[in-house]
């Protein structure tokens, strides 16, 4: 934190730990470490986003960075020309849609698959990939009265950041407009996850594309 560039790598983060998670899961490190002063949290999945992040870090003067990566091979969703900007969310779909999924890491693929399924049903949503928390975009979506679903494959660092930022800015938010899904229980209590495949764990936590569709359709 004293002008030193230190990047911490978390490999197989979130529920990507999968069947190796009998002893531990990388789901609570992010909400614990984000309490460190000046730490920048970045949670990525797309390989091109990863390259863009590494180029950003290599420029120097970034301080403490927690870079969280997936284990599985991931599909590219961004162009090679992507320029990473810390604190920026990337919107996929209609920005005027009344419902928005906010996610990060491998959750972006579940979000995009849910978006596709809902589009086939005649409903358009937006999906926001937030590898790092975008305070301005979150505030904008809230003030526009959007229905927001935080879908996080960890203990919920984006929603925690959201609560802090809305309080800091004095922006009122309605619990009726905000829904959260994470590795916490539905009562938002932290828990230990058992070992399982990614698919099994995503289903357990209600974070699969199918679960996101059902949550948006029946609960929002």
PLM features: residue spans?
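Conserved thiamine diphosphate
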Residues: 1-100
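Thiamine diphosphate
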Residues: 17, 65, 70-220
């Amino acid at each position: 934190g004293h002008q030193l560039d230190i990047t911490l790598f978390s490999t197989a983060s979130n529920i990507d730990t999968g069947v190796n998670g009998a002893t531990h899961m990388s789901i609570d490190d992010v909400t614990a470490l984000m309490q460190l002063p000046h730490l920048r949290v970045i949670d990525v999945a797309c390989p091109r986003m990863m390259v863009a992040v590494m180029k950003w870090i290599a420029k120097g003067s970034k301080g403490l960075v927690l870079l969280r990566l997936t284990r599985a091979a991931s599909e590219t969703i961004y162009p090679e020309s992507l320029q990473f900007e810390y604190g920026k969310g990337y919107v996929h779909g209609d920005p005027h849609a009344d419902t928005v999924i906010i996610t990060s890491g491998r959750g972006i693929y579940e979000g995009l698959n849910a978006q596709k399924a809902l589009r086939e049903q005649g409903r358009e949503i937006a999906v926001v990939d937030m590898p790092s928390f975008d305070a301005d975009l979150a505030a904008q979506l809230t003030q526009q009265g959007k229905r927001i679903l935080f879908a996080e494959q960890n203990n919920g660092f984006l929603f925690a950041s959201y609560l802090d930022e809305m309080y800091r800015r004095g922006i009122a938010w309605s619990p009726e407009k905000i829904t959260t899904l994470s590795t916490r229980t539905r009562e938002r209590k932290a828990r230990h996850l058992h070992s399982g495949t990614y698919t099994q764990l995503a289903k357990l936590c209600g974070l699969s594309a199918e679960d996101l569709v059902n949550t948006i359709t029946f609960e929002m």
